[in-house]
Amino acid sequence: VNKKSRYYFSLDENIKQKIDLNKIYSNYQNFYGTKLNINQDEFIEKIKEIQKKINLDDKIKNINEGVGFPFIIPKLSSADIGSNIKNIFLPALKKSYKNKFQNYEFINHIKFDLSNKLDIRKESRYENIISKSLNEEIVGILYPCLNEYSFPAAHEVLKNLPEKFVLSGGYEIISALIGTPEMLFDKDKYTPLLWFSSMKNFDDENISYHIEPYGYNITLNERAHLNQAAEYWWHSLSILE
């Protein structure tokens, strides 16, 4: 962890006020390309219930002092992370981002087929999301709260949190962006790179994937992290219903 931060990279200071549950649900309806079993009222109720439970737990309630981005992961027919990201999440993100920012776009810099290329990092608890997504839609909240952490440091944080938390991965990060495409948009400041904290390249522990702003576009890419921390590298936690 970087112990002294310049706070050079940050989210829009007004982003919390821009989170609109009705608009988020509408974006999922419009861009996922599949019918959701959960309706809008149920989605809103589930998010409010998650927030209420967090606020009642003194050990974790401070996380709500930051910003959390609600998401829905659709029911998936495959456990192949790369295929799902390629075929379901990225097309929806491309449409949602262009709908919000007509002059900018989402760009995928990964030119190879992602199928069978992504794996779960040990002790990330992400197997909970993979297994649950095969049976039902998942509602939760993404908290990009581990600013300037390394992968090992993010894993250490998770060890001390209740089981309902997981290290965030591509499903929630991309889903949160589909719902709130302005999540990493700020015309005045630089916003951070978000690692898929629970994921790695299938063959190399030191390579992972991330969403990164570039100008006013957002991009998907991979890189080696070597278990280091950097001021523009952020990790995230997700909490599920």
What are these regions (language model features)?
Residues 1-166, 172-241:
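A binding-site-centric feature that preferentially detects glycan-recognition modules on secreted/surface proteins
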